[in-house]
Structure formats: structure tokens, C-alpha cells
């Protein structure tokens, strides 16, 4: 099935200015006229700075402000899913009245954006997106962190995402004995998920930007049968402005504004920091349609691709949707005219953000409707 929906909304989001993280570019050290002090050579939105001596400086602050509307109705808690790497997950469940009497709820595994270099489940923007999804879909949402570049270049993020889905499988099915996870026992996590009414048969893998890239590769990794996830069924994939690049620039890239939220300069910086040594933007994890990438095949469940009409990555995103459909996948492409990259995560409470949530809900509700259709005389 192939459906294209164009959403034309009048609201426009302006990027928020942000001061670089400390330290600022240092001057030469006192008493040393021959050696220059380490200085900033790469800066990612003031959140990550790489110094000339190779060290990195990270700020805990988010690069843009998002209104805090956490009123406590959505219940959430943190856990650690990868103790060796210190990686956490934030788990959300709808208000109790949304859970009671409505049957099992779908699961939404969510991976944040940030060019594989910045981002956190704890960022207010990521937290707000997940609050909305949990309350309004409604769904049990799990927002996973992953290792970031340049300290951990690709494929570290994708390896962590696969570990995250396996961790979720084990906690939903009790396949591993309870072990301390750093913020409570596995038994606590299992009990929390069980009390959420989560349905292991309706898992949607999702993400924004770099996280949407991860969501695609989890679809490719686990395949149509959900191999390796046991009784957990992948019902679909929600890709919001996926970060797919290509070595050859596309028309949407060439025509993008220099002051866009995701400009060519910013995208190049992320690529320099995230790609493995010697790789270019056709690296298979960055370009699923590249010359060295495995062919696209059938994935578990349907695919939703959300695109901003002014996103410099638009052409690669649309081409991806077309190719996925051509090999037999059920793909829905939704284009938000006039919107730049990151329009949802930067302002999740806007009317545009509300429309994104409605699009995702309709997409997920289709799966619920399909499940109740009789097949071969059975339900």
C-alpha cells in the first residue's frame, strides 16, 4: 500500500540562539610562547565541543528550550538497560484512566536525534515528545539512550539499539533472570511494564532524525519475522525525518538555506564526527540506498516516514520511501510543507507537533484494526 499525505500548516518555528558550552576558545598558556593551548575545532550547537588536542567537552544543557508541561499524569521512570556502557532508558505509561478497561497498549521504542553526536532521553525536547506519545496515542513508550560520537563512532549507536530491543524483549517475556540494573531490579522493571498493560505483540520502533535512521536499521536487522525478538512482534516503524545522507548532493540539499536548522555545514560536521575513519556519506548505516548498502527488503510491519518539506534531507527521505514501497513494504509518506528538519522535536507542543502525533496515532490504529479483522475464519 502506498499513501502520500501532504500537511500544509501555517505555523513556523524559528531556531533558538544558544551560547557555546564552556570552556571558550583558550589563549596561549602563560609563559609558553611556542605551544598553543587546546582550542575548539568542532562545535555541535554548543552542546559538544571537540578541542584541537582531541579531547571532547560536553554540556548537560540542551541546545534549545522546550516548555515543561509535565503535569504528572503520565507516569515515567528511568532504568539502566546497558550497565557496561551506563546507558539508560526512560519508560512512560499513560495515565491510569487511559490504561484501565482499554485492553493491552502498544509499545513505542523511541530513539532520539542529534546527528549521532548529541542528545539524551533527558533532554526536555525528547521528554516532551515522549510525554505526548504516551498520553495521546496512547502507548507505553521507552526512550533509549545510545553511545554518542565522536567518542563512539558508528556503528556503536546501532549496536546499542539492538541491545535495547533485546533488553526490552527479555523484560517483557522473562527470558533472563533478574539482575540489578543500576536503578532497581529487573523484577521491578518487569512489574512496571506488566502494570502498564503493554502488548508484546504490538511493538513500534521509532525515532527522530538520527533516531529514525536507527529505527530503519533495526527493521532491517530483525527482518520481517522479527528474528531474535522471540514472541515480541514488530508491528511497524515510525521514521520522523530520518537522517539519510549521500555522497552526491541532492537537489534539496543544494537548495537548502545556509541558516536552516540543519544546514549543509552542520550536517557535514555531524558526518565528520560520527562516521568511522575512512568512511564517507555513502557509508551503509548512513545511506541505505548507497552503492555498498545491502538491498532493501521486507521488514516487520508497516513503515511511516514523516518528512519536512524544507528539510535538506527531504530528497533522500522520499527516495527511501519510494524504494521501500517498490520492494513490497507497506509505506506511508507524510510531507509537512514548509517545515525544516527537526520541526517536531524542537517544538513538540505546537499545532504542527499535534498533527505529527495525530498522524502517528492513525498509523498505529491501523495496526489495531488489522488485528481484529478475521483471517481464515478466526480472529
Predicted features and spans:
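Intrinsically disordered, low-complexity basic segments at termini and long loops, enriched
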Residues: 1-27, 94
Amino acid at each position: 500500500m502506498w499513501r502520500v499525505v501532504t500537511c500544509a500548516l501555517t505555523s513556523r518555528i524559528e531556531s533558538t540562539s544558544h551560547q557555546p558550552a564552556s570552556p571558550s576558545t583558550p589563549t596561549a598558556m602563560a609563559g609558553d610562547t611556542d605551544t598553543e593551548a587546546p582550542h575548539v575545532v568542532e562545535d555541535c550547537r554548543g552542546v559538544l565541543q571537540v578541542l584541537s588536542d582531541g579531547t571532547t567537552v560536553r554540556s548537560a544543557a540542551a541546545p534549545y528550550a522546550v516548555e515543561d508541561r509535565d503535569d504528572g499524569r503520565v507516569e515515567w521512570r528511568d532504568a539502566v538497560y546497558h550497565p557496561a556502557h551506563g546507558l539508560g532508558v526512560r519508560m512512560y505509561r499513560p495515565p491510569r484512566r487511559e490504561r484501565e478497561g482499554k485492553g493491552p497498549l502498544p509499545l513505542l521504542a523511541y530513539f532520539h536525534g542529534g546527528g549521532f553526536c548529541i542528545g539524551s532521553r533527558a533532554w526536555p525536547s525528547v521528554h516532551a515528545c515522549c510525554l505526548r506519545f504516551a498520553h495521546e496515542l496512547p502507548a507505553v513508550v521507552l526512550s533509549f539512550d545510545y553511545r554518542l560520537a565522536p567518542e563512539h563512532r558508528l556503528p556503536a549507536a546501532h549496536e546499542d539499539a539492538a541491545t535495547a530491543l533485546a533488553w526490552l524483549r527479555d523484560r517483557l517475556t522473562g527470558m533472563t533472570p533478574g539482575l540489578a540494573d543500576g536503578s532497581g531490579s529487573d523484577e521491578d522493571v518487569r512489574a512496571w511494564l506488566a502494570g502498564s498493560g503493554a502488548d508484546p505483540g504490538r511493538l513500534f520502533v521509532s525515532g527522530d532524525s538520527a533516531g529514525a535512521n536507527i529505527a530503519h536499521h533495526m527493521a532491517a536487522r530483525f527482518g520481517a519475522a522479527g528474528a531474535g525478538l522471540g514472541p515480541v512482534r514488530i508491528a511497524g516503524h515510525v521514521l520522523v525525518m530520518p537522517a539519510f545522507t549521500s555522497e552526491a548532493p541532492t537537489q534539496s540539499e543544494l537548495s537548502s538555506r545556509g541558516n536552516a536548522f540543519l544546514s549543509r555545514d552542520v550536517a557535514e560536521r555531524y558526518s565528520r564526527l560520527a562516521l568511522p575513519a575512512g568512511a564517507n556519506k555513502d557509508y551503509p548505516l548512513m545511506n541505505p540506498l548507497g552503492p555498498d548498502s545491502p538491498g532493501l527488503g521486507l521488514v516487520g510491519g508497516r513503515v511511516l516516514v514523516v518528512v519536512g518539506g524544507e528539510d535538506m534531507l527531504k530528497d533522500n527521505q522520499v527516495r527511501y520511501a519510494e524504494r521501500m514501497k517498490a520492494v513490497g513494504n507497506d509505506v506511508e509518506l507524510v510531507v509537512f510543507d514548509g517545515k525544516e528538519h527537526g520541526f517536531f522535536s524542537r517544538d513538540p507542543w505546537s499545532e504542527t507537533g499535534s498533527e505529527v502525533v495525530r498522524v502517528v496515532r492513525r498509523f498505529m490504529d491501523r495496526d489495531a484494526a488489522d488485528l481484529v479483522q478475521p483471517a481464515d475464519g478466526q480472529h
